[in-house]
């Protein structure tokens, strides 16, 4: 039994010595040597498009408040250029193709609304003339106005005075038609202004996308900086 313990002890000692030799045989490598080699950065620099977009928006906001339609169209154009500078290249191309498909439809709708507005405006003018004439005729009959022709006075005939109720109804209808036409024309003006703004935005966006490198050589629209020659 004692010999078995001695033999077991010798085996454990030899195993421990072997593990110690294997551990010492490992070579320690310095951390700086184990790091991968460093290369010069070759990735493109971050795009300056967001900065340009902010500058364009600041330009648009620092102008006047945009009370007129021309100033509102100017702000819409500034916003479209800023959006084009901010978007990704692929998204920019997708928007350009969509705008090219939508613009003819918007222009067609704009032409139809303008024709409709012209018809309503003409109807408004006719109703205004009818309301004015009926008002003058009714007022003259009620006040028994006498007209002088070649030195002789001529009063309004009785049969014409009997038309006052009908003229009053016509005057009321013309006035109501004027109110309806004015409201419709105002609504059409808002729709036309909105469509004009959309057309301006989409055209400005497409113009910004098609801008050549010679016009914007330092900040091209592909999202990367170009070296100045």
From Swiss-Prot:
GO terms for cellular component: host cell Golgi apparatus; host cell plasma membrane; membrane. Its main location: host cell. It is a multi-pass membrane protein. The chain crosses the membrane at residues 119-139, 162-182. The keyword tRNA-binding does not apply. Keywords: Host cell membrane, Host Golgi apparatus, Host membrane, Host-virus interaction, Inhibition of host innate immune response by virus, Membrane, Transmembrane, Transmembrane helix, Viral immunoevasion. Forms homooligomers via coiled-coil motif. Interacts with host OPTN; this interaction inhibits innate immune response. Plays a role in the inhibition of host innate immune response. Interacts with host OPTN and thus inhibits the recruitment of TBK1 to the host Golgi apparatus. In turn, downstream partner IRF3 cannot be activated and IFN-beta production is impaired. Belongs to the orbivirus NS3 family. This is Non-structural protein P8. It comes from Bluetongue virus 1 (isolate South Africa) (BTV 1).
